[in-house]
């Protein structure tokens, strides 16, 4: 038998398992694309300071993270942002708005549209290098052309460095919240980070994730051993649950909110904050139900002082047109993933 070294075997395995589709991507080169000017960065920092005050409770405005399920079309997202910016000006004394610009989408079985990062044209080829450029461009345009800051989902923790200078709010999704790497990277984010309950609805799992995100952690991150500073602005998002038989279990009702408040009280968590996701398994993806869900939660805030104290944010899926379409149908401003509220109902 021919003698082979472990290193040669490893090299052969690497060649079999992964095929390089691009050269090594340089972080500094990527961040030089769509880089904020000093003036633009200062405007973002001012908005970020306001958001931090909302999260800490020193600013009593209600937080609204709102926008399309997926940011699939740059011009439609920008048109939505322009309208939203005008609405923010009208309600600025009561509500602080951050726009959802979700550029990568988790897929239950790996199939389907995975977001702007993967496909700049939903019907086109996959190119993640061009996707990074498109993602940065979209986040910057929303900020610089409308003054709104943006939210995105941290689907891939290793990509955080590529967008952290442009994004003001990060979310860890229901499929990712049990993953240790997501929890540990969340503990190093300098911005508010919402942790969704897992699809099972298990609140213990959710608060384990919250605890991990609010502690200092040591981990391997992008080729280095690092220690995080902890994230005191990490908080929970209630998005409902899904049973094995496919039925949904909402968790925005009065009793559900009290259970989550009780979980907050039992732990030594910083800046207690509950956000209610009005779509997904809370609405059963019946997008019009989002209006009723908001009304119910607001009523419960009036009824119970603790709910008013803890529940201080909504995450709402909204776009220019009601509902959804299949990729390629070409309806401007209508979702190609989960159905969303149209603009008139959003207003």
Summary of predicted features, one role per range:
Residues 3, 8-15, 81, 94-259, ...:
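Active-site-facing alpha/beta catalytic cores
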Residues 4-8, 12-56:
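N- or domain-start disorder-to-order transition segments that initiate the globular core
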Residues 69-72, 271, 279-285:
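Short acidic, Gly/Ser-rich segments with clustered Asp/Glu that frequently serve as metal-coordination loops
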Residues 63-76, 338:
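Conserved phosphate/anionic-ligand binding catalytic regions in large, soluble enzymes, centered on
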Residues 319-347:
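Internal helix-turn-beta structural module
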Residues 52-60, 266-271:
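Glycine-rich phosphate/diphosphate-binding loops that line cofactor/substrate pockets in enzymes
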Residues 67, 276, 342:
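Conserved, mostly hydrophobic/aromatic
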């Amino acid at each position: 038998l021919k003698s082979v070294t472990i290193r040669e075997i490893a090299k052969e395995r690497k060649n079999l398992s992964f095929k390089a589709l691009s050269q090594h991507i340089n972080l500094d080169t990527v961040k030089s694309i769509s880089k904020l000017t000093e003036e633009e960065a200062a405007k973002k920092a001012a908005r970020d300071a306001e958001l931090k005050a909302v999260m800490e409770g020193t600013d009593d405005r209600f937080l609204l993270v709102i926008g399309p399920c997926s940011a699939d079309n740059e011009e439609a997202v920008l048109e939505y942002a322009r309208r939203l910016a005008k609405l923010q000006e009208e309600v600025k004394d009561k509500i602080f708005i951050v726009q959802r610009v979700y550029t990568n989408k988790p897929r239950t079985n790996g199939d389907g549209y995975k977001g702007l990062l993967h496909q700049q044209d939903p019907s086109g080829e996959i190119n993640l290098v061009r996707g990074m450029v498109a993602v940065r461009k979209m986040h910057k345009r929303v900020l610089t052309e409308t003054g709104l800051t943006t939210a995105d989902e941290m689907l891939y923790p290793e990509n955080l460095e590529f967008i952290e200078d442009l994004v003001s709010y990060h979310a860890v999704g229901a499929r990712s919240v049990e993953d240790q790497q997501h929890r540990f990277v969340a503990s190093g984010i300098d911005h508010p980070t919402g942790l969704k309950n897992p699809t099972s609805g298990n609140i213990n799992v959710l608060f384990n994730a919250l605890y991990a995100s609010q502690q200092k952690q040591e981990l391997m991150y992008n080729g280095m051993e690092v220690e995080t500073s902890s994230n005191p602005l990490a908080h929970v998002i209630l998005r409902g649950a899904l049973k094995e038989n496919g039925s949904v279990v909402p968790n925005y009702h009065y009793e559900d909110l009290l259970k989550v408040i009780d979980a907050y009280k039992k732990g030594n968590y910083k800046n207690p904050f509950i956000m209610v996701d009005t779509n997904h398994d809370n609405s059963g993806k019946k997008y019009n139900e989002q209006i009723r869900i908001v009304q119910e939660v607001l009523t419960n805030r009036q009824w119970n002082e603790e709910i008013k104290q803890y529940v201080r944010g909504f995450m709402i899926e909204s776009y220019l047109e009601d509902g959804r379409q299949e990729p390629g149908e070409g309806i401007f401003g209508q979702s190609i993933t989960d159905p969303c509220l149209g603009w008139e109902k959003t207003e």
